[in-house]
Regions:
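Active-site acidic/histidine proton-transfer and metal-coordination neighborhood
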Residues: 69-160, 245
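Histidine-acidic metal/acid-base catalytic patches
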Residues: 1-3, 17-23, 81, 85-95, ...
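Short, hinge-like loop/turn segments at secondary-structure boundaries
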Residues: 50-52, 76-79, 117-118, 142-144, ...
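Active-site regions of enzymes building and remodeling cell-envelope glycoconjugates
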Residues: 55-56, 122-124, 210
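Hydrophobic faces of well-ordered beta-strands that scaffold small-molecule active sites
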Residues: 3-9, 30-34, 58-62, 99-101, ...
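Acidic-and-aromatic substrate-binding clefts and catalytic sites of carbohydrate-active enzymes
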Residues: 9-18, 33-46, 66-75, 103-111, ...
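N-terminal pre-domain/capping segments
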Residues: 1-86, 160
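Short amphipathic alpha-helices and their capping/turn segments at secondary-structure boundaries
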Residues: 39-57, 111-118, 147-155, 177-189, ...
Length: 257
């Protein structure tokens, strides 16, 4: 496999530190993509210990809409930039391979671009989104879900691109496009980073199924994801005590690549 494989964890996942060390030493994965939960800086020294003592590399995923960061909402600018400062701490102190942001949900593309341009002293990538996400009483539209808006963000913000194949599939299905052709089109935007999980091939809503539990042609997807360097596995975790399911997913991916 030509990618560096990423294990997705959250900054509060102290329960996974021991198995993460074990799997790294067994070469099951190459780096950790750490979701920086807001107000969790007290956990940063624990992750720095993994980096220093076990030589584990890190990437950072910034908080997104569900954790309170929404670049598309002008009323959240001050809060968004405060969360960005926490993200910078994680990225700088862990010497992150990359840092990923979502553009926002429910607001305007112009506002997302305006706020993302205000993130200073941090090199980052934007991640493409599904077209819609379920909310409490309805559905909301995501910023950065169609090709033109993604291309515009990359051009005007000047950031890198993280291609989430599952998000792309959901967006394509909502737009009435062939999902595999859409993934191939997005790959022309030269992503450095990929995210992958399984889902129903016709899904419009995102899911993070284990590989083989959905109907996506994952071997075909992997053939389309060419040119990038990092591939983070975003499947669900079944246990709070171990990462055995991640071993299965990682091996599955390697077997079909």
């Amino acid at each position: 496999m030509n990618y560096k494989i990423g294990l997705k964890l959250w900054s509060l996942n102290e329960n996974y530190i021991a198995p993460a060390i074990d799997l790294f030493e067994r070469e099951v994965y190459d780096y950790i993509e750490l979701y920086a939960v807001p107000n969790s800086l007290e956990m940063l020294p624990k992750w720095k210990t993994l980096a220093k003592e076990h030589k584990i590399k890190f990437a950072i995923h910034a908080p997104h809409f569900s954790s309170g960061l929404d670049f598309s909402n002008p009323n959240k600018l001050k809060h968004n930039l405060m969360l960005c400062d926490e993200v910078k701490r994680y990225s700088n102190e862990l010497e992150a391979l990359y840092t990923v942001f979502h553009p926002g949900i429910g607001g305007s593309l112009n506002e997302s671009i305006r706020q993302m341009k205000m993130v200073q002293n941090l090199k980052f990538a934007m991640e493409n989104k599904p077209y819609i996400v379920p909310m409490n009483s309805s559905e909301a539209f995501c910023i950065g879900a169609d090709f033109n808006s993604i291309a515009r963000i990359l051009d005007e913000v000047g950031c890198e691109f993280c291609l989430d194949a599952g998000h792309a599939l959901c967006s394509a299905n909502y737009q009435g496009l062939n999902p595999y052709e859409y993934i191939a089109k997005l790959n022309k935007l030269n992503p450095k980073i990929y995210h992958i999980s399984d889902n129903d091939e016709n899904a419009k809503l995102d899911a993070h199924m284990h590989f083989g539990d959905g109907s996506i042609d994952l071997a075909r997807v992997l053939r389309l994801l060419r040119g990038g360097e990092f591939l983070a596995i975003e499947t669900i975790k079944d246990s709070k005590d171990n990462l055995d399911d991640f071993i299965i997913d990682s091996n599955y991916l390697k077997s079909i690549s």
